Each structure stands twice: as structure tokens, then as C-alpha cells.
């Protein structure tokens, strides 16, 4: 398994993390088998959120872990997220602390390796976030902190008050959904890709040693579903097949390898409940696309080069 440096050289972690969003419908035995399958391939980093399956993803994962003596907590890296509530966002101190207690209870563990703030809260008071993080860090409940879907200035505002470094920003990124790189290459152009929606987020995170985690790595824009095999992206799928045949792997593997080829040293967050699909994604760690192949896929997705 290829490794990604987490934050400012905190530690190395697998370049492919197991996203648990779609695991809430698994039985405890199915979850146990899935966890073992991931660990056997070196994917010991598991990404949760308190809202996934209304908490069921964490609960079933925790039960499968707690009932299997062969699964050791120190062999897993557990990340979860909080801050999204029904109809609003809440990054208050009270809610963060309550959320983490619930997460730990459901996961049957006494600490999280990494806690992320799931979405920016327009009413956030960074002093409250800082106070919550201090309690969680000093009590040993959370070892590291980060954010998800945050812009650079939102991170700056939090970091002004938060004493612990924010080491991760989890954002959507795939071949079609790649404005993070498009606005950097279409600078000074009157094109849709030139619009900087994210405040130079990619460059900011690289400058500040914040690891970018890529969620929905196979998603089309506007939540239209997976682009693999989709009739909306015929040129991209054709190019994926050509390159996949060259490396004797699947198109899924090549689409994941495209993300890992970027020098920002990103970490992929999978979204699959399939062990075979997980294996295909992990296989991307053994593929290094050429510069030409990376750009061919980028252009095949409909992006422009000035």
C-alpha cells in the first residue's frame, strides 16, 4: 500500500482510506468480513461520520470490532466527522463534545485518531471550537484534528484560535469534478474553469502541510452518479479503457490512480461497500500514470487547456 504523509509529517497513512458512508446496511458479520478484507490489503484507515446511516455505520462497525478479539484498536486508524444536524450545521462546543462522546460509544473505542469538522457553520464561534478541541485533546479522546469542505480563510479563522494544527481537509475531487486544479490552469481566462470557487484551496493546503482527502473519487458533477461507464462521459470512459488495458487493470483503478498521480500527495476516501471494488481502488497504489496520461484523462473529461 502506498502511503501519504499526514499533515506536517505527523505520520504516514495509507493512500487509500476506507470510507464507511455506505456500510450502514451491512450485518455485523458482513462488516467484520469487510474490515478484515481491508486490513489484509493494508487499508487500516477508516473514515466515519456521525451522520452516516444516522449513526448506524459507526454502530455496526463498532460492534463488529468489539466482538472480534483478533481486531486490535492499535491496528486501525479511526477518523470521524461531526457538525451536521437535521436542517442546520452546529460547531458549538456543546455539540462537538456531545457528538464525539456518541461517536466513541458507537465505535466501542475510547479515542479517535482524527476528528474533522464536517461542514462550515455560518454561525461558528472559533473560540468555542478551540475550547472543545482543548477538552478533547487533553482528555485523550481525540489525537488530531482537521476539517472537511472548508475554504482557506475558514481554516485560517479556526486556526487563529485552535491550538492544535488542522492536519486534514476532506473535499470532493475526481476527474470530472476537478475545479481544484482547473482554476489554476485556466487562470486569466474567461472560461468556467477559471472561476476560483475554493479560494486557491489546493495551493493553500500544500503550502500549509494540510493533507487533502478526496471524497467521491468517481462522482460526476451535480450528484449525477458515478462517471465510470456513464454515457455522459464517453470520451473519458474510452480513454480510461485504453489506459487500463495498457496497465492490465480496471478503469476504476486508473481513475483512482489519476488522483494519486497529483503531487499534492492526496488520500483517496473510498465510498464502496464492495470488497472487489475496494481491491480495484487499492490497486491504484501500484500505478503511476505518465504526465501525458494524466492530462489525456483530464481533457477527456471535458476540461480545457488554454
Predicted regions and their residues:
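Short, acidic/polar
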Residues: 27-38, 91-107, 153-156
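Short, small-residue-enriched loops and turns at beta-alpha junctions
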Residues: 24, 54, 85-86, 119-124, ...
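Active-site mouth loops of central-metabolism enzymes
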Residues: 19-29, 82-94
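Hydrophobic faces of well-ordered beta-strands that scaffold small-molecule active sites
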Residues: 14-18, 46-48, 76-80, 115-117, ...
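Active-site groove signature of glycoside hydrolases
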Residues: 104-125
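N-terminal binding-site loop/beta-alpha segment at the start of enzyme catalytic domains
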Residues: 1-76, 138, 219-221
Amino acid at each position: 500500500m502506498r502511503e501519504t504523509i499526514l499533515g506536517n509529517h505527523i505520520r504516514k497513512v495509507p493512500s487509500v482510506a476506507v470510507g464507511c458512508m455506505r456500510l450502514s446496511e451491512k450485518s455485523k458479520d458482513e462488516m467484520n468480513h469487510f474490515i478484515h478484507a481491508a486490513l489484509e490489503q493494508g487499508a487500516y484507515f477508516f473514515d466515519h461520520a456521525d451522520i452516516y446511516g444516522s449513526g448506524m455505520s459507526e454502530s455496526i462497525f463498532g460492534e463488529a470490532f468489539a466482538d472480534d478479539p483478533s481486531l486490535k484498536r492499535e491496528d486501525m486508524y479511526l477518523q470521524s466527522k461531526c457538525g451536521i444536524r437535521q436542517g442546520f450545521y452546529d460547531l458549538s462546543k456543546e455539540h462537538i463534545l456531545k457528538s464525539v462522546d456518541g461517536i466513541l460509544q458507537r465505535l466501542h473505542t475510547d479515542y479517535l485518531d482524527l476528528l474533522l469538522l464536517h461542514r462550515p457553520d455560518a454561525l461558528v464561534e472559533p473560540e468555542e471550537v478551540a475550547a472543545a478541541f482543548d477538552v478533547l485533546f487533553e482528555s485523550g479522546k481525540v489525537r488530531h484534528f482537521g476539517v472537511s469542505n472548508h475554504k482557506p480563510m475558514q481554516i485560517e479563522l479556526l486556526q487563529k484560535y485552535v491550538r492544535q494544527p488542522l492536519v486534514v481537509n476532506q473535499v470532493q475531487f475526481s476527474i470530472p469534478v476537478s475545479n481544484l486544479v482547473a482554476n489554476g490552469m485556466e487562470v486569466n481566462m474567461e472560461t468556467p474553469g477559471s472561476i476560483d470557487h475554493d479560494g486557491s484551496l489546493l495551493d493553500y493546503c500544500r503550502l500549509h502541510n494540510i493533507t487533502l482527502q478526496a471524497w467521491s473519487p468517481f462522482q460526476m458533477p451535480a450528484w449525477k452518479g458515478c462517471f465510470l461507464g456513464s454515457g455522459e462521459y464517453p470520451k473519458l470512459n474510452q480513454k480510461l479503457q485504453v489506459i487500463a488495458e495498457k496497465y492490465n487493470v480496471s478503469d476504476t483503478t486508473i481513475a483512482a490512480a489519476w488522483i494519486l498521480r497529483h503531487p499534492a500527495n492526496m488520500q483517496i476516501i473510498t465510498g464502496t461497500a464492495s470488497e472487489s471494488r475496494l481491491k480495484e481502488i487499492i490497486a491504484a497504489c501500484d500505478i503511476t500514470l505518465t504526465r501525458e496520461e494524466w492530462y489525456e484523462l483530464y481533457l477527456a473529461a471535458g476540461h480545457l487547456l488554454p
